[in-house]
Amino acid sequence: MSNQFKILLFAKVKEVIGKDSIFIDLPLDESTSFNLIRKLKHIYPQISSTLEVSLLAVNQEYISRDQDIKINSNDEIAIIPPVSGG
């Protein structure tokens, strides 16, 4: 069995992948934030370095990069890359 996660994409990640959102499957026993990022890096190596400096938001709350949390298929998950401007 697995969970399917909808991941909302923003800024550079959205530009590189070319979509507003993607779907990722993870086994039930591996449905954590660390495993999600690991799988994203594997599927989309072109955003790997951006993911290293991006924030992960689960249900509109930022998750610390060193915090591995359990995620559920009904959670709202977003990848928030750093934004630069001038």
Curated annotation (Swiss-Prot):
User: Could you tell me where this protein is found in the cell?
Assistant: Cytoplasm
Name the SUPFAM superfamilies on file.
MoaD/ThiS
Pathway the protein contributes to: Cofactor biosynthesis; molybdopterin biosynthesis
Q: Which domain of life is it from?
A: Eukaryota
Q: Does the keyword Cytoplasm apply?
A: yes
User: Which key words are in the record?
Assistant: Cytoplasm, Molybdenum cofactor biosynthesis, Nucleotide-binding, Phosphoprotein
GO CC, sorted alphabetically, is:
cytosol; molybdopterin adenylyltransferase complex; molybdopterin synthase complex
PTM-bearing positions, type Glycyl adenylate = 86
What terms describe the molecular function in GO for this protein? Answer: molybdopterin synthase activity; nucleotide binding
Residues that the record marks as modified (1-thioglycine) are 86
Asked whether the keyword Metal-binding is assigned, the reply is no
GO terms (BP aspect):
Mo-molybdopterin cofactor biosynthetic process
Q: How is it modified after translation?
A: C-terminal thiocarboxylation occurs in 2 steps, it is first acyl-adenylated (-COAMP) via the hesA/moeB/thiF part of mocs3, then thiocarboxylated (-COSH) via the rhodanese domain of mocs3.
Name the family: Belongs to the MoaD family. MOCS2A subfamily.
Job of this protein: Acts as a sulfur carrier required for molybdopterin biosynthesis. Component of the molybdopterin synthase complex that catalyzes the conversion of precursor Z into molybdopterin by mediating the incorporation of 2 sulfur atoms into precursor Z to generate a dithiolene group. In the complex, serves as sulfur donor by being thiocarboxylated (-COSH) at its C-terminus by mocs3. After interaction with mocs2l, the sulfur is then transferred to precursor Z to form molybdopterin.
Q: How does it assemble?
A: Heterotetramer; composed of 2 small (mocs2s) and 2 large (mocs2l) subunits.
Name this polypeptide is given? Molybdopterin synthase sulfur carrier subunit
Organism of origin: Dictyostelium discoideum
What gene is it encoded by? mocs2s
